[in-house]
Amino acid sequence: MTWEYKVSTGILSHNGKLIAYCYSGAGESKDKPNCEHIRNKGPIPRGVYFIAGWNNHKSPAAIILEPIAGTNTFGRDHFEIHGDKKGQPPGTASAGCIIMNGQDKRQTIYDSGDTILVVR
């Protein structure tokens, strides 16, 4: 089955079940699909992504997302699902990544075994 993230609402779901409210993008571009082309400001571009693994670079249990062929990323890259950054105001950590707080929730994504995320 698949994971789904809806940019305009911030809803992350798995097989139709609400998992978390998230955000993507920064400032005036946050959660606005029509800003997906703006580097370091717009939300993650709509398309299909492979859940490729995890790392602890941006936050514990950050999920690595790789676009699948046919997904237009507008030359943008290094998308992840990670948490807000410590020492910064909440809601300001995204330069295009999906921000979902709660390491346990991110671990659930990875542990699910489902490796497809559809961004709408």
Question: Where on the chain are the PLM-derived regions?
Answer:
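Exported/periplasmic cell-wall-interacting domains
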Residues: V48, G53-R120
